[in-house]
Each structure stands twice: as structure tokens, then as C-alpha cells.
Amino acid sequence: MIAQTKIDTKTTGGGTDQIQIAMTLLVRDEADIIEDNIRFHHAMGVDQFIIMDNLSMDETPQILKRLSAEIPIRIIRQTDDDYDQGTWVTDMARQAAQLIGNGWIINNDADEFWVPRSGSLKLFLAAL
């Protein structure tokens, strides 16, 4: 699911350097894939990540902390065992909108990889 906020191409000039992309992920015990996911999407043009970790018992929290030293990641520790996905994802989307303002927000799962034909999420989104 992609949530869009309007991009004013008159203001941005329509260039991909002006497009901001944030990705949200709700994760739990994703140590086997989370680093690959974040590195891949960062290389594809995602500027900011907001990642909510819900009670991971594996190395996911340590991986996120290590990656946040080199990639813009806002880590949210969700310790509530009442799984409230709708509320949590909405909260992450709101935080992403505050971070990037007039840009794009992609809600993603740790095992999903967005592979645009153009080779760049920014090029793909600029063409829309």
C-alpha cells in the first residue's frame, strides 16, 4: 500500500532529487531479512525509515540500532502485546509525513521488496 501526499512539481521542478520517500515497517523477529530490506530500499531511494519493533526476541533490535548509525531510521519500540496493527501503522504514517512533509510514504513488510522497472523508486514516483 502506498500513501501519497501531493507533490507540487512546479515547486520541486519535477526532479527526482526533490522527491522525499519514507518507508514504514512493523516488524517482529525479522533478523533474517531486515538488514537486506533496509539496505535495498535505501539504495532504491528511500530517504527515511520509521520502523516499529513489536516484541522481537531475536537480533532485530540490535540490527536496527546498528543500521541507524548509517541510515536515517526512527526506531519505535512497541512493547504492547495487544497487537493493534491499524493504530500502529497509522501512527508511523503520521510520523513519516511529519518527517518528509510533501513526499511519499510507503508502508512495507520486512519480506516485501519494491522493485521499480526504472531501477529507482524516485524515478518511478516522479513519473506518476
Model-flagged regions — what are they?
Residues 1-39:
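N-proximal low-complexity "stem/linker" segments adjacent to membrane-targeting elements
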Residues 109-114:
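The conserved acidic donor/metal-binding loop of glycosyltransferases
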Residues 47-55, 76-79:
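Short beta-strand/loop segment that forms part of the nucleotide-sugar
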Residues 40, 94-96, 127:
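A generic secondary-structure signal
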Residues 39-48:
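Short, acidic, metal-binding catalytic loop of nucleotide-sugar glycosyltransferases
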Residues 61-107:
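Active-site-proximal specificity loops/subdomain of glycosyltransferases
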Residues 117-128:
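Conserved donor-nucleotide/metal-binding helix-loop-beta segment in metal-dependent transferases, i.e.
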